[in-house]
Structure formats: C-alpha cells, structure tokens
Amino acid sequence: TAEVMSXVTAXFGXALEEXXDEXG
C-alpha cells in the first residue's frame, strides 16, 4: 500500500542520509 511504501521510503532515506554523512 502507499502507507507501506511511504514508511519504507522514509526509513531508507534516513539510512541513506546517515551513510552519506559517515562517508562525507
């Protein structure tokens, strides 16, 4: 459902940002 995708996208986005911060 849209809600599931939204939650997954939000979690993935946060993790992606953290990875970028660690690498940066």
UniProtKB/Swiss-Prot annotation:
GO terms for biological process: sensory perception of smell. Keywords: Olfaction, Sensory transduction, Transport. Antenna. Present in the aqueous fluid surrounding olfactory sensory dendrites and are thought to aid in the capture and transport of hydrophobic odorants into and through this fluid. Homodimer. Belongs to the PBP/GOBP family. This is General odorant-binding protein. It comes from Antheraea polyphemus.
